């Protein structure tokens, strides 16, 4: 059954992966519309909002102040090239009872009432989109850039006072997963490092081949988790492609693996270093 949801993607960077993220999401959850803000028409079956190359501030401004103009369904499902639906059976119509839902933030200094959540793969209601355009919500990139922090932390009290409903931590975890380390089955995910746990071999390989920045820490963690999960061919492919862009990639990867092993207290990660 098609949901009264508009998939929204804003990207002028990872065109092929962005298109695939939309396709994968639609295969898990049929949605009424797709709206793409991009410099290319990467999804002809949707509505294309032509934009120039976007800065991070441009992205945040669109997400906070412009979505209400382009979303005509009850909810918007924000998708990114590394944030998408994954496990169809984990969809729950209860998600639609809330105005904002995304993966919980892992930061220890956030109290429980400020854990929801990540905007990279998130569900947002019309109520929220219309409140965000209010002059009471001011985008101040010199103080705070990430648009999801405006929703989940900075303006949360004001939004709640105007009727915005946030889900429990448990329901947010069922909706999406971002936290590293530690895999939890959920409807969707955000972050390249989660690809090894959520995408099949075909989609994972395409992700690895089209990934724009193969030497970032997130991408390194992705390669490590392919190896950790016994998907050595994909791990080695990720390493091989990254080495073409950065000759010292293996040394960087070993440092990342050592750091991850310490932070997660995972001795298996140390064993992976020997296989690189």
Predicted region positions:
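Catalytic core and acceptor-binding pocket of nucleotide-sugar-dependent glycosyltransferases
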Residues: 116-230
């Amino acid at each position: 059954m098609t949901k009264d949801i508009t998939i929204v993607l804003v990207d002028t960077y990872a065109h092929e992966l962005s298109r695939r993220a939309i396709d994968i999401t639609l295969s898990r959850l049929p949605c009424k519309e797709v709206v793409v803000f991009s410099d290319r028409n990467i999804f002809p079956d949707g509505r294309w909002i032509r934009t120039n190359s976007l800065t991070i501030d441009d992205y945040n401004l669109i997400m906070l102040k412009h979505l209400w103009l382009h979303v005509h369904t009850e909810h918007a499902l924000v998708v990114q090239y590394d944030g998408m639906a994954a496990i169809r059976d984990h969809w729950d119509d209860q998600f639609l009872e809330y105005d904002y839902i995304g993966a919980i933030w892992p930061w220890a200094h956030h109290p429980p009432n400020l854990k929801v959540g990540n905007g990279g793969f998130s569900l947002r209601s019309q109520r929220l989109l219309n409140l965000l355009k209010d002059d009471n919500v001011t985008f101040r990139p010199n103080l705070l850039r990430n648009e999801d922090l405006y929703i989940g932390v900075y303006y949360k009290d004001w939004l709640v006072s105007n009727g915005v409903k946030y889900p429990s931590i448990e329901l947010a975890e069922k909706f999406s997963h971002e936290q590293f380390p530690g895999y939890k089955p959920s409807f969707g995910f955000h972050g390249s490092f989660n690809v090894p746990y959520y995408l099949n071999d075909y989609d994972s390989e395409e992700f690895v081949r089209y990934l724009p920045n193969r030497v970032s820490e997130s991408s390194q963690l992705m390669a490590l988790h392919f190896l950790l999960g016994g998907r050595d061919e994909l791990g080695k492919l990720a390493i091989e492609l990254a080495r073409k862009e950065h000759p010292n990639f293996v040394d960087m990867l070993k440092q990342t693996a050592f750091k991850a092993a310490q932070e997660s207290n995972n001795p298996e990660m140390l064993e992976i270093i020997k296989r690189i």
